[in-house]
Swiss-Prot record:
Temperature dependence comment: Optimum temperature is 30 degrees Celsius.
EC number: 1.13.11.88
Example of a GO MF term: monooxygenase activity
Quaternary structure note: Monomer.
Protein name, UniProt field: Isoeugenol monooxygenase
Function as written in the Swiss-Prot or TrEMBL entry: Involved in isoeugenol degradation. Catalyzes the oxidative cleavage of the side chain double-bond of isoeugenol to form vanillin and acetaldehyde.
Organism: Pseudomonas putida
GO BP term (any one): carotene catabolic process
Family: Belongs to the carotenoid oxygenase family.
Regulation of this protein's activity per its record: Inhibited by HgCl(2), AgNO(3), CuCl(2), phenylhydrazine, 8-hydroxyquinoline, R-cycloserine and p-chloromercuribenzoic acid.
Ligand binding (Fe cation): 167, 218, 282, 471
UniProt catalytic activity: (E)-isoeugenol + O2 = vanillin + acetaldehyde
Main EC class the enzyme belongs to: oxidoreductase
UniProt note: pH dependence: Optimum pH is 9.0.
Length: 478
């Protein structure tokens, strides 16, 4: 029998498991769905299907994919488990068999050699495929309508990396997808693999290189001519794994390395810039101005997850606050330094943009924001996954426009839908799941980006609660 400790901070509030597979036809709607919204809003959520082990972490739950399917003003909802070999093994045993996060030395002997990924972090759509991905393994292909699992996906044998980022980048001009694999030859390796995939699913470029030290890597940045790889001091260690300790340790004395690689370059061509110890989970966008690379991203002083640190200091939440920041890398400089500028002080994460304008100087970005002037319905452990507001960042005004979700509500990562294929940048709608914590259920809100603070133009009402998701995407029917 599954049991979940409601006093566990990682199982509280928006993060309490729901474990619901559902197929809900014709959802209730308040307001009117804009005509532009025809397609699917995909999401991926970590959900523990069985009782968690004492040392569990939220980000290690099984993948539970979901989709809101929009057609002609009507909305249907579906959610399905991502049926990985790990999921199937634990379902058969009716108990947890896999141990600490990304540490195979803590697993039950019966699952030795089984793919450990839970494919729980993002949904990727490209070359007609819908993929559930997590960075510790290859993605799993899903049926675009039913979300039933079709199997592990290696691009028909073209991707030999053991791992695949949950945050590939897309070139709106060429239709290419760019991706990397970190610890690409296994958890204990420094190897990085980098691929470019054309719009038809063919790998057109591949190269490999080594990290300066073994590190947790979640996201990267791409411009027209460059790919940028941030290596930050959340380090991994074979010795720690064998000692059955957490895989990562925060080692600020190592500093950070920022690798800049020509977009179709070879691993030997990478140039390393340096920065102090810092952490970046998510990149907004990157572009070039002459010989400079500019990157907007969410930067914090330390890794926001409480892994051990080399100074044996307690976890400090005040240093784990992600803030919108701009990096500037001068490729003509004679040194390895870069410039970093904080753009705003508010806690903000899960950024997206109008991806039609990716890889160029953009004006708008969209994200979850904790407005300090408003009450929070969520707790410390839920930060990064839930927010009291949704925000539009304007690079011209250098400020946010915010919509407050409500005293007992919390928003999740948004998705952007343009008003029309040729609409100006940022002219469209934001979609976000909002947890109504006092009602134990969720809504999907639709906000007009031209008047965000006015509130939803339509609300899709679910009869149950959705757990805090990690990432999703919008896929138009066209």
């Amino acid at each position: 029998m599954a049991t979940f400790d409601r006093n566990d901070p990682q199982l509280a509030g928006t993060m309490f498991p729901t474990r619901i597979e559902a197929n809900v036809f014709d959802l209730e709607i308040e307001g009117e769905i804009p005509r532009a919204i025809n397609g699917s809003f995909f999401r991926n959520t970590p959900e523990p299907q069985v009782t968690t082990q004492p040392f569990h972490t939220f980000i290690d739950g099984d993948g539970l994919a979901s989709a809101f399917h929009f057609e002609d003003g009507q909305v249907d909802f579906v959610s399905r488990w991502v049926c990985t070999p790990r999921f199937e093994a634990e379902r058969s045993a009716r108990k947890s068999l896999f141990g600490m996060y990304r540490n195979p030395f803590t697993d039950d002997p019966s699952v030795e050699g089984i793919d450990r990924t839970v494919a729980n972090t993002s949904i990727i759509t490209h070359h007609g495929k819908v993929l559930a991905a997590k960075e510790d393994g290859l993605p799993y292909e899903l049926d675009p309508q039913t979300l039933e699992t079709r199997g592990r996906y290696d691009y028909k044998g073209q991707v030999t990396s053991h791992t695949h980022t949950a945050h590939p980048k897309f070139d709106p001009q060429t239709g290419e997808m760019l991706l990397f694999g970190s610890a690409a030859k296994g958890e204990r390796t420094l190897d990085m693999a980098y691929y470019i995939v054309d719009r038809y699913g063919k790998v057109t470029h591949e190269t490999w290189f080594k990290q300066p030290y073994g590190a947790f890597m979640h996201d990267f940045a791409v411009t027209r001519n460059w790919s940028i790889f941030p290596i930050m001091p959340a380090t991994n260690s074979l010795e720690r794994l064998k000692a059955k300790q957490p895989i990562y340790m925060w080692e600020p004395e190592r500093g950070s390395y920022i690798g800049v690689l020509p977009r179709r370059g070879q691993g030997k061509d990478i140039r390393w810039f340096r920065a102090p110890a810092l952490w970046v989970f998510h990149v907004v966008n990157a572009w070039e101005e002459g010989n400079r690379i500019l990157i907007d991203l969410m930067e914090s002083e330390i890794l926001p997850f409480p892994f051990p640190n080399s100074q044996n200091l307690p976890f400090d939440p005040s240093k784990a606050v992600p803030r919108l920041t701009r990096w500037e890398i001068d490729l003509n400089s004679g040194n390895d330094e870069m410039k970093r500028t904080q753009l705003h002080e508010y806690f903000a994460e899960m950024p997206i943009m109008d991806f039609r304008f990716a890889l160029q100087d953009h004006r708008y970005a969209y994200m979850g924001v904790d407005d300090p002037r408003r009450p929070l319905a969520h707790q410390q452990a839920e930060k990064i996954f839930a927010y009291n507001s949704l925000g539009v960042w304007d690079n011209h005004r250098k400020d946010y426009e915010l919509w407050f979700t409500g005293k007992m509500s919390a928003a999740q990562e948004p998705a952007f839908v343009p008003r029309s294929p040729d609409a100006p940048e940022g002219d469209g709608y934001l979609l976000s799941v909002v947890g109504r914590l006092d009602e134990d259920r969720s809504d999907l809100v639709i906000l007009d980006t031209q008047c965000l603070a006015a509130g939803p133009v339509a609300t899709v009402k679910l009869p149950f609660r959705l757990r805090a998701a990690l990432h999703g995407c919008w896929q138009s029917k066209n």
